[in-house]
From Swiss-Prot:
Chain's role: Phosphorylation of dTMP to form dTDP in both de novo and salvage pathways of dTTP synthesis.
Species, as recorded: Wolinella succinogenes (strain ATCC 29543 / DSM 1740 / CCUG 13145 / JCM 31913 / LMG 7466 / NCTC 11488 / FDC 602W)
A cellular component term, taken from the record's GO annotations: cytosol
Catalytic reactions on record: dTMP + ATP = dTDP + ADP
Record-linked SUPFAM superfamilies: P-loop containing nucleoside triphosphate hydrolases
One GO MF term: dTMP kinase activity
Gene that this sequence comes from: tmk
Annotated protein name in UniProt: Thymidylate kinase
Keyword annotations of the record: ATP-binding, Kinase, Nucleotide biosynthesis, Nucleotide-binding, Transferase
Transcription regulation recorded as keyword: no
Enzyme Commission no: 2.7.4.9
Length: 190
């Protein structure tokens, strides 16, 4: 089973991945962007704001996604696989493009493979503002709360567009409570 953990920056994806690693030590864990050697280089470019045009940014994400699919996801499809982000985030971040065209491009990059299930960690504006105030920002986080809240909505929209079963949880719950809901209410149900 391929499970993607989605949400905007600071929502707790990394914390949940760490808890899932302890709970499922035999599972495969990856992230997007950056789940391959090429992906790490592309991630640095993307988070550093090196891509100045929206088209260049989109193409870098798609290159990472295709490489990640070939080297990490496809070989692990018969195992329990957790990914910190997926094509859903890539589509959500690619604002300003036709959604059906984005879907086609991303499905081309993934060879039609999408997560079996998606967990979306959702933040309120107040909680997001607080969490952002507690850390330094990369080029995406520096776009601000309004941008990230819009992105959060797009993550939900892209999940629906792809028709993937999802579980949306409040990221303001304790990490342990979120973890329990992911495991009992979603992952273990198969």
């Amino acid at each position: 089973m391929y499970v993607a953990i989605e949400g905007v920056d600071t929502c707790g994806k990394s914390t949940q991945i760490a808890l899932l690693k302890r709970r499922f030590p035999g599972a495969i864990f990856t992230k997007e962007p950056g789940g391959t050697a090429l992906g790490m280089k592309l991630r640095e470019l993307l988070l550093g704001g090196e891509a100045k045009s929206a088209k260049a940014e989109l193409l870098l994400f798609l290159a990472d996604r295709a490489e990640h699919m070939e080297l990490v996801i496809k070989p692990a499809l018969d195992k329990l696989l957790f990914s910190d982000r997926s094509l859903i985030s890539g589509m959500a971040y690619a604002k300003g493009w036709d959604e059906l065209w984005l879907k086609s491009l991303n499905l081309f990059a993934t060879e039609g493979i999408v997560p079996d299930k998606v967990v979306i960690l959702e933040l309120t504006a107040k909680e997001l503002s607080y969490r952002l105030s507690q850390k330094s920002h990369d080029s995406i986080e520096s776009r601000g709360v309004e941008y990230l809240l819009e992105l959060q909505e797009r993550i939900k929209q892209m999940t629906a567009l792809l028709g993937i079963p999802s579980l949306t949880l409040s990221a303001s719950l304790s990490p342990e409570e979120i973890h329990g809901r992911i495991v009992s209410g979603f992952v273990l149900k198969g």
